[in-house]
């Protein structure tokens, strides 16, 4: 049996993503491509599903929130994704530009890749941009780093197995640090070390071996 080697997928870190968001790009084509990429980062939707997204896929809930309901082209899995402020702004920005009821005009993959390469260079990101990377960034940067459970991420990304989601969602050092801060707050004052009679000077003076011999001698005396 051949052992599977885990794949280390790249996702944008917070600094890279902020550079991308705030960049003033020189042409409409680059701005449009950047916005499609950002939409993917905030929704986890890949290029193929983005191209097929229509107004009928946008559902308004009773509380007024808007959601994307789609079946992924690749797996046919149902995905329900809440639209946050930035993707809602992007939809409004490009309203009416898509054909046949589609939300967006999405260029061919080769043209997108060419534009993404230029954007990455102009923003000094130090990495290549792809829509696979956008999905990884959705799982890690947008969801997991902000406390969204991996089961929920898996459902939104249209995965049938959480193991697949684990490939996309990577635990960052920032996430670990924040989780441990929460753990520290939640356990503060809940536990106490009992007084076992061991003098603290034993450890301060490094005289543990001598203290241990005293205890053993005392135990032997009690047994006699």
Report residues per predicted region.
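Basic, Lys/Arg- and aromatic-enriched nucleic-acid-binding interface segment
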Residues: 1-47, 97
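C-terminal catalytic core of Y-nucleophile DNA break-rejoin enzymes
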Residues: 6, 73-92, 98-118
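Short basic/aromatic active-site micro-motif
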Residues: 32-34, 107-110, 126-146, 159
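C-terminal catalytic core of tyrosine-transesterase DNA break-rejoin enzymes
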Residues: 38, 42, 48-49, 118, ...
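Short, polar N-cap/turn motifs at the start of nucleic acid-interacting alpha helices
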Residues: 57-64, 126-127, 147-167, 174, ...
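C-terminal secondary-structure termini that scaffold catalytic or DNA-interacting sites
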Residues: 183-224
């Amino acid at each position: 049996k051949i052992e599977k080697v885990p794949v280390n997928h790249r996702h944008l870190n917070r600094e890279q993503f902020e550079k991308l968001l705030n960049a003033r790009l020189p042409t409409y084509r680059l701005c449009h491509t950047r916005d499609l990429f950002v939409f993917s980062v905030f929704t986890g939707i890949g290029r193929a599903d983005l191209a097929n997204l229509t107004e009928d896929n946008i559902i308004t809930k009773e509380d007024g929130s808007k959601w994307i309901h789609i079946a992924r082209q690749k797996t046919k899995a149902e995905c329900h994704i809440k639209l946050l402020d930035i993707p809602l702004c992007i939809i409004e920005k490009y309203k009416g530009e898509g054909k046949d009821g589609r939300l967006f005009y999405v260029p061919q993959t080769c043209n997108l890749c060419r534009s993404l390469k230029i954007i990455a260079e102009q923003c000094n990101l130090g990495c290549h941009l792809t829509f696979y990377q956008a999905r990884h960034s959705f799982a890690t940067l947008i969801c997991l780093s902000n406390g969204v459970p991996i089961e929920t991420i898996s459902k939104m990304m249209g995965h049938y197995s959480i193991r697949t989601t684990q490939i996309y969602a990577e635990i960052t050092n920032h996430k670990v640090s924040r989780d441990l801060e929460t753990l520290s707050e939640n356990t503060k004052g809940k536990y106490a070390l009992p007084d076992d009679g061991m003098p603290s000077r034993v450890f301060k003076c490094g005289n543990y071996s001598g203290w241990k011999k005293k205890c053993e001698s005392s135990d032997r005396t009690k047994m006699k």
